[in-house]
């Protein structure tokens, strides 16, 4: 009886070891970079307008440096010009986003505040709107257009 119990315990241990190996393997594979399905890597010319709370023109560069599946990461650097006062400000920060439905681009730009951009991609141009909020509940919003720069 002791031998039968030992044999069952050994078999149970093997099954647990195999199951654990499969689970760990599955987890490891899911975090590996996947082939890009969107092909956004590179430099994009950014133009836009902030319509609230104060009207500003926005110009700069969106650089996509990493893609995995439908996700992407990079950096946005902008020069903002207040249309009333003429004051110029440089802002920049990291971005992360994703593509869905074949042509919808959605990304957050961590500038002075987080600005969520949602736009449609057609060929080498993305156009859309953005909205940002600060801790003091001020809401900023506007439109944007980015065009791929040729290498």
Where are these regions (language model features)?
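Bacterial N-terminal signal peptides that target proteins for export
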Residues: 2-16
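C-terminal motif of bacterial Sec signal peptides marking the signal peptidase cleavage site
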Residues: 23-26
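N-terminal helix-cap/turn-to-beta initiation motif at the start of protein domains
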Residues: 29-45, 64-69, 120-123, 149-151
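Tryptophan-anchored aromatic micro-motifs
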Residues: 36-58, 76, 126-132
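Glycine-centered tight beta-turn/hairpin loop motif at sheet-sheet or coil-to-beta transitions
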Residues: 53-55, 112-114, 137-139
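N-terminal glycine/threonine-rich, aromatic-flanked beta-hairpin/loop signature
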Residues: 55-98
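Short glycine/acidic-enriched loop and turn motifs that connect beta-strands
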Residues: 79-81, 133-136
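Acidic, glycine-rich flexible loop segments
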Residues: 98-125, 130, 134
